[in-house]
């Protein structure tokens, strides 16, 4: 029997005017996800997906490149205004935000949603360099 050809699911163009940007900036990488108001992903990118490897992923420039790529993908879906949610302690937070602003989006709000423990779990041991 002949193999059935795989169907490639093509992402149809959604017409979304406002959306939410989640910038997750860790010490090792920066992930940017653009979702609609329900939380369905429109576009995503990360420093690692842009070809940065190792310690270069954690740089502000890598976050800027990832944010610019994500903005280009979101523009194809008609996104104009953004709400920004920033999470994590990494170095790519501000540069990713600046890259989204320079891409021509209207930023309506910026929220820091970094989880802060109220004396919860014991933290990992301190690094001694």
UniProtKB/Swiss-Prot annotation:
A GO CC term assigned to this protein in UniProt: ribonucleoprotein complex
GO biological process: translation
Annotated InterPro entries: Ribosomal_uS11, Ribosomal_uS11_bac-type, Ribosomal_uS11_CS, Ribosomal_uS11_sf
Gene Ontology MF terms: rRNA binding; structural constituent of ribosome
Source domain of life: Bacteria
Assembly and interaction partners: Part of the 30S ribosomal subunit. Interacts with proteins S7 and S18. Binds to IF-3.
Function: Located on the platform of the 30S subunit, it bridges several disparate RNA helices of the 16S rRNA. Forms part of the Shine-Dalgarno cleft in the 70S ribosome.
Protein family according to the UniProt entry: Belongs to the universal ribosomal protein uS11 family.
Name of the molecule in the record: Small ribosomal subunit protein uS11
Source taxonomy: Bacteria, Pseudomonadati, Pseudomonadota, Alphaproteobacteria, Hyphomicrobiales
């Amino acid at each position: 029997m002949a193999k059935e050809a795989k169907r490639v699911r093509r992402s149809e163009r959604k017409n979304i005017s406002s959306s939410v940007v989640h910038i997750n900036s860790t010490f090792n990488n920066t992930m940017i996800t653009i979702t609609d108001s329900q939380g369905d992903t429109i576009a995503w990118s990360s420093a690692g997906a842009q070809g940065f490897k190792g310690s270069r992923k954690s740089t502000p420039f890598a976050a800027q490149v990832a944010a610019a790529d994500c903005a280009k993908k979101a523009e194809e879906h008609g996104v104009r205004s953004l709400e920004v949610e920033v999470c994590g302690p990494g170095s790519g937070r501000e540069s990713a935000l600046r890259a989204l602003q320079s891409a021509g989006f209207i930023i309506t709000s910026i929220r820091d949603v970094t989880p802060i423990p109220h004396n919860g779990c014991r933290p990992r041991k301190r690094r001694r360099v």
